[in-house]
């Protein structure tokens, strides 16, 4: 699959993993996210390596990220979407999600899931809705796996 590269408002949106910085992703997820505080670098790197990733770059520095965990045929789970605080309010999360959702292979997926505490409005713009029949879904949840008991996930 050929990497995407879009210039947007002085930022670069790309799916090229060679341009991404796993150390920056780890730093943000482990220190700033509410869903994976204290996550070890090795886990972030393994997740990165095994996902379809998208990033926002400013002058070569990674300031945003998201990933689809997918089989590329029927299912995907959208995860770890963020934009660093100084760059928020510029439509960058929206542009990342839009770029992902516009891919032909993504349009052909039967189911795309995500979990969010505070970005329902963003995802609703792309067709995401609350689960209607949540009784069909089951989960194993281990919220303290990275040693942070305050995580809401």
Where do the model's predicted regions map?
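Short amphipathic alpha-helix that is part of the acyltransferase structural core
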Residues: 1-39, 149-153
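Short, basic/aromatic-enriched C-terminal tail that caps enzymatic domains
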Residues: 4-10, 131-150
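Conserved active-site alpha-helix within GNAT-family acetyltransferase domains
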Residues: 108-142
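A conserved beta-strand-loop-helix scaffold within acyl/acetyltransferase catalytic domains
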Residues: 42-59, 63-82
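Hydrophobic pocket-lining residues that define ligand/cofactor binding sites across diverse proteins
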Residues: 104
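Conserved acetyl-CoA pyrophosphate-binding loop and the N-cap/start of the following alpha-helix
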Residues: 87-96
